Structures are given as structure tokens and as C-alpha cells.
């Protein structure tokens, strides 16, 4: 019996391997090989090893502080648009800003958003990142309604209060891991915007599970992963259930409250401003959003609000620390604002608009740090670009990083130089030509990009006017599975005044 079972298992495994090899061989020709014949000239490149392609080479490069060689070497051999094979399928990589611009603008027509199956499963099919067409348009519009108004006085006051509340937990002379502290701020802010829950045991428990979920984004989602909880992907799947479950409980309770109130939310039926995103969803389109849609949507906004903004905060401090002249100029700008307002007055929109050098620092941090390395798209139709045809169904990766760090577009591109943004036409030209695309572009332009700038600006204001700091040890950046520092960027803090109230 045991021998027969083993033989059966071996046969099944052999069939799976043969099927995977055949799939890989078919990918060499691709879906357009028969359809287009000789006209289907794919961008040049290499599919790497059978089954795994060049995935291990890409991961190996992006787990270092200098992942550029992976793309640079292939661009040198094949040009700005080349073919590789990563994460289980053939993928066209673009380091060409003109082609990237085409891809961003063609969302919903020639291409659609497409990400590795691990991300799709963990975020949910109804998430903002993965929905398409009319569904994406309505979610994007709702996000803009809630997060695209950073000038709102209540929101500014809440950001200011939350940043200071986190800093009050730091000892007058403390060592903190800045990346972790920044993530607490952005996570708590996002949770507040989503479900109106203040920081506490519930939010911290949710955050711990959420970190496990994020770790699984670029892991290999093999079929039995859900049965193997010791794997990164298995742990991420379990964490996803817990995070979704916690959000679902809040949403269910709010739906019940709405039903008890005869279809209205709360006592003040005439109020113009919704208190959070769940309320926006419950009221939108006559309450047509399902429970699962709301769960997936809220979970995806946690990703957008948590990982990217917190890394922007961390990298801004890291790059400023490594560039003393920039730090000195930033301190002067914020000291002037503090002196005009008084230390205990919360920041207002007019103060934010009085931070021009801060915006230069944020732009340069986005350009050099490349928190979002690029975006995945899938061709809805055959795409003809220059002498190449990218067939329908092919995965495409538009690399923002390759463009941002190209000396053809930025002088000494790999040097942190915030002063380059003080020349207004430089910024306008870069943005207008889609050479500077840290928040994407086209219909999928990040709806919370201005809010992210406001959060980082307020954080930097309170940090530089209340603390001095120094790195406790050398820490380096890596870019897989997400952009982060290996040690969380530990720094020694020293309070500059007696109180940070």
C-alpha cells in the first residue's frame, strides 16, 4: 500500500514537473508566436533558467543596497525595453520613460494593472490595486474624497496630534528604530481614517498581523502554502484572515448600526463630512458596496497608507543625516515657522505651504529612495512600440527606479541633492514628461499623494524642532520584498527642550 502510494505521488509529481516545463517552453514563443508569425518580434532578452527564469537574480539584486545592475546590465545589452522571466512568467521590463508614459496613460485600454498572484490573493480581488474599469474608477473616486483633502483642518489637527503623541513616548535621551516608529504613526493614522479607532491594543494587535501579511507579498504562492503555516506565504495567508476578520467585525457593527437607525448613520443626519472611510462606503451609491468589497478596499488602503509613507519618513531622515547641509537648511526653515507660531500651536495649511525646501527634500527622497520601484501591467491587446510587438496577455513592468536614477535625466542621479528641485522648470519638466513618477500616473495616480507629503512634512517639522539625533550604527537599504532598512534605522535621540507638548 505504502509503495503504491509513493509511486502514485511520484507519478503526480512528474506530471506537474512536465507540465511546468512545457509551460515554460511555450512561454519562449509566447501567445503571439502563432497569431502574429514573423511580425511578433518581442523585445530582446533572456528567459533564464527553466521554471524559475531570472527570478532569483532579480531577488538577489534587490536584496542589496544597489539593485541597479539587474536592469542596467540588460539595458546595456538589449536597450531600454527588454524581456525577462520573473515570478513565474515572461515579463517585459521598461526603463524607457516614453514607454512608461504610454503604459501609465493607457491603463484600462491597452493595458490593465496586474501583480503577482501572491499580492492579488493577500490583498483581495476587490482591492483598489486590483480592480479595473468602472469598479476601479468608483473606488479611486471615493479614496480621493476621503484622502485627497489634506487641507481639512480636522485632518491636519489629527496628524499633528498623532505625530506628537508618538514622540512623547520617546525618552528625553532614547534609542529608537525610526522605521518602526514611522510605521506606528502611519498605521494609526490610516486606521483612524478608515474606521475611526484611536491607537491602542486593538490597533497594535492589528498592526502585528499586518506586518506578517506584508512579508508575504513577493513570496512564492505554491499550491500547498496554506497548509504549511511555517512558510512566509502561509503565515501571510493566516495573517490576512485575521486582519480581514478584524476589519469585518467593525464593518458589520457599523452596518448593523445603520440598519437600526433606519438607514442613516449616527444622529447628525445633516452633517456634510463623513467621519471615516467606512462611513463613506456605507453611504456611497445608496449603500451598494458589499461587506467583502469594503473589507478588501480597507485592507488595500492600509497597504497604501502604511508602507510607503512610513518609508518616505524614514528615508528622508536617513538622507538628511547623510547630507548635513540639507539638514541645516531644513532646520532653519522649520525654526522660522516655529518662531512665528509659537511651539504649542498646531500646524495649519498655511504653515505647510511655507515649507518649500521641505518639499524639495521630499521630492529628492522619493526620487533616490524609489519606495515604489515601478508598476506591473498586462497587455489587453498587441502593443507595437518601436520595432517590437508585445503580445496580448504579456506582463509588463514599468520601472520608475531605472528612470529616476538615470544620469540622462538627472545630473549625478544617484546623489541626494534636494537643491536640484529649487529650479522650478526642472520639476515641471520632470513631472510633465513623466520622468518623475513616484506616485505613478494616469488613471491610477496615487489618490493620497498630497496627504503623504503633508504627513511627512509635519513629522519632519516636529522632529527637527524638538530633537537632535545621530545614527547608532550603519544601516543599509534593501529593496525586496519592499524598500526598507535592514535594521530599522536605529538612532539616538536627544530632546532639545523640556517639553514636546
From Swiss-Prot:
Known EC number: 1.14.99.-
Chain sites annotated for binding heme: 446
Family named by the database record: Belongs to the cytochrome P450 family.
Keywords on record: Brassinosteroid biosynthesis, Heme, Iron, Lipid biosynthesis, Lipid metabolism, Membrane, Metal-binding, Monooxygenase, Oxidoreductase, Steroid biosynthesis, Transmembrane, Transmembrane helix
Native source organism of the sequence: Oryza sativa subsp. japonica
GO molecular function terms attached to this record: fatty acid 2-hydroxylase activity; heme binding; iron ion binding; monooxygenase activity
Membrane topology: Single-pass membrane protein
Protein's recorded name: Cytochrome P450 90A3
Needed co-factor(s): heme
InterPro entries from the UniProt entry: Cyt_P450, Cyt_P450_CS, Cyt_P450_E_grp-I, Cyt_P450_sf
Pathway: Plant hormone biosynthesis; brassinosteroid biosynthesis
Localization per Swiss-Prot or TrEMBL: Membrane
Tissue: Highly expressed in shoot apex and inflorenscence. Expressed in roots, stems, leaf blades and leaf sheaths.
Entry's transmembrane regions: 2-22
PROSITE patterns registered for this protein in UniProt: CYTOCHROME_P450
Recorded superkingdom: Eukaryota
CDD domains per the UniProt record, alphabetical: CYP90-like
Pfam families: p450
GO annotations of cellular component type: membrane
UniProt function note: Catalyzes the C23-alpha-hydroxylation step in brassinosteroid biosynthesis. Converts 6-deoxocathasterone (6-deoxoCT) to 6-deoxoteasterone (6-deoxoTE) in the late C6-oxidation pathway and cathasterone (CT) to teasterone (TE) in the early C6-oxidation pathway of brassinolide (BL) biosynthesis.
Induction of the gene: Down-regulated by brassinolide (BL).
Main location: membrane
Reported consequences of knocking out the gene: No visible phenotype under normal growth conditions.
Gene Ontology biological-process entries: brassinosteroid biosynthetic process; brassinosteroid homeostasis
